[in-house]
Amino acid sequence: MLKLAVLAPFVIAVSAGSAAANSASWQAEILAAHNEERALVGSPPLVWSEKLAADAAAYAQELADSGAFDHDPGNESQGENLWMGTRRAYSAREMVGSWAEEKAAAMRDRRWWAALDETGHFTQLVWSTTRTVGCALVSNRSDDVLVCRYYPAGNVIGQSPYSGRSR
């Protein structure tokens, strides 16, 4: 089972399949997956943030403990992407890839925010003015919960995810 959630200005990422969750190799894998998708649309690479990863870990733990799957209502300054799926069934690349699948919808409409639930993960993933990311993966009995935090946040209504300029 795979679940995704998005709200402006939020979007996020983490992996369980290959590298041990939250290890240095896992961090490198999820960062590489982000940056590969960003390169495809000409966005500059992201840099890993331990602070964002710590914030993501705290919220991922809260979601895993509660079984809830909603964006953090107390987070107003960071972009956020959420992912939830069957425990140990998906790699970091597959998790990020699920957000990247929204590219077709985002490319179809210049007013991407009109369909944020269909495009918001992808647009945060590639948002050109976002510079840092931190992700964390937490598991409960049945699911992996991935939270990725971004700064500065993307999904700014009226701006292009590719240039930071108004459309």
Residue ranges of model-derived segments:
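A solvent-exposed, acidic/Ser-Thr-rich amphipathic alpha-helical stretch
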Residues: 75-96
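Flexible, active-site-adjacent loop/turn segments at secondary-structure boundaries
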Residues: 44-46, 50, 67-69, 80-82, ...
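Non-transmembrane alpha-helical segments in soluble domains
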Residues: 35, 57-61, 83, 96-100, ...
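Bacterial Sec-dependent signal peptides at the C-terminal "C-region" and cleavage site
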Residues: 12-24
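Bacterial N-terminal signal peptides
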Residues: 3-15
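Disulfide-stabilized extracellular recognition modules
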Residues: 89-167
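Short, well-ordered surface patches within globular domains
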Residues: 22-79
